[in-house]
Amino acid sequence: MTEITPGSHGQGDSPPPGSPGASPNVGPVRDSVADLPPGTPTGAERATDEATAAVVGARRPLDIGQDIDLPAGTGAATVGTPTLLGLPQTRQVVQPAFDEHHPPDPALIGDCVHCGFCLPTCPTYVLWGEEMDSPRGRIYLMKEALEGEPLDDSMVRHFDQCLGCMACVTACPSGVQYDKLIEATRPQIERRYERSRSERLYRDLIYNLFPYPKRLRALRGPLRAYQASRLGNLLTRTGLMRKLPAPLQAMESLAPKLGPVERVPERTPAVGQRRAVVGLLAGCVQGTFFPDVNAATVRVLAAEGCDVIAPRRQGCCGALPGHGGREEQALDFAKKTIETFEQAGVDYVVVNAAGCGSNIKEYGHQLRDEPEWAERAEALARKSRDISEFIVELGPVAERHPLPMTVAYQDACHLAHAQGIREEPRKLLRGIPGVELKQLTEAELCCGSAGTYNMLQPEPARELGERKAAAVLATGADLMVTANPGCWMQVATTLARMGERMPVAHTVQVLDASIRGVPVEELLERALTGPGTALARPTPAQS
């Protein structure tokens, strides 16, 4: 029976999978399987499994309860008596990587045919070319874990290095739901794997600060004082900044310029005839660090005929802890958000942060196990809209004044990939007289923000930020526009670190300026120097 290897084109043996020049389509394809007994793996299936196993070192599944020597911190339970020094013996009983509470679905894992179309869209595979840092490699690791492999340091590292950008979901011709798989894996890691003490402390800091608007607002005063003192410049010049742990350096550099808080009214009436009553999700980071975006959102919605209700007692929607695998915390936030907007009595909930919008639209799935919440969660998910999605759906009626400028629109992953919203923001920007859109190269590639990724994985995030910043600069545009606060901070900070000055704004701020007749020069100046702009300092090599 003849076997051919895709990508060889009759020019001899193709390079081994995972090596430079290898085709992403791993494995031979048979011309017929009619003579194979039922259940026999095809050549493609056998070769793919063999190739992937070779990449991961031919790790074989372990029997549950099997004794094996493992380093501490693998998530396995230690057995036996302590040594004389009080340290545990190294003989450990291997526990299954995943518990029974919603592990990755084997049926979804089986949907992956290892075709490789995801590889050029995966940020970590693009950076390193490592099979296990690709979607299909991580799916293979999930399969291993389901078969009994423990959650060791290496496996967890590959999962942690995934940005969760969902570009692979967009690229996959087989419709593999990698988003569901990685979102099921992260809570398992948080429950089953013991991280180092320093990492636990840092993660606790992030997830006990950023999802809490009151705590963030309390931080504004000290942070503004720090920015005004220019202490950061001194720390950078003396080299002391480089002595901080990389995650703390990343957190310090990402903080945008803070200005006065522009709080939106609890209720804003429509201009002219009322067309809808909408609720505004203020957001945690958006509401604290980018209050101008919320103010612009309210003005645009009112101009388009909407009564806007911004509930005072709203909090985090659960996106940040949810993406970090902190399931219990995320579900608690989700329930509070549902109650808040049920009480508000709105027709729609409008969101101006891509990560928050994609999370709310998954409430029904997240709360599927709780009968008293499942239907309510699905109801809120159905009425949630991104600001650009909502205005296009409603139909814009407010007059647009000219803004003669070129715009580089940067797709936020959780808008383009997670929600499938690409054309709506572009349509709204093109509807402004004088605006010319510029296309970015590698538009599908994540900028490296990915929720808390740029604080937890600063090195790959920095590399991805530099690629995105270079792509933005290459357009020669007057203004970069995006739809997510994380993307804004990531790209703006990278541009500043590179010594480049480029204005950055949210889509709705451009719409607001056009509706209000703000001169283009004023818009660009505020986007370059106003609140929300980057304060990162050029690296020493460029200063």
Role assignments for model-derived ranges:
Residues 3, 8, 19, 55-56, ...:
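N-terminal glycine-rich, Lys/His-bearing helix-loop that initiates the first secondary-structure elements
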Residues 79-104, 132-153, 271-277, 291, ...:
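Short, charged low-complexity linear segments at domain edges
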Residues 3-6, 178-543:
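Iron-sulfur cluster-binding electron-transfer modules in prokaryotic oxidoreductases
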Residues 6-81:
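N-terminal intrinsically disordered, low-complexity tails
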Residues 80-98, 125-157, 175-204, 500-508:
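Non-heme iron-sulfur electron-transfer modules
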Residues 3, 61-91, 118-142, 414-417, ...:
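A broadly conserved sequence feature marking short terminus-proximal activation segments
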Residues 110-116, 120, 160-163, 167-170, ...:
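Cys/His-enriched microdomains
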Residues 111-113, 117-139, 161, 165-188, ...:
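Iron-sulfur cluster-binding cysteine motifs and their immediate structural context
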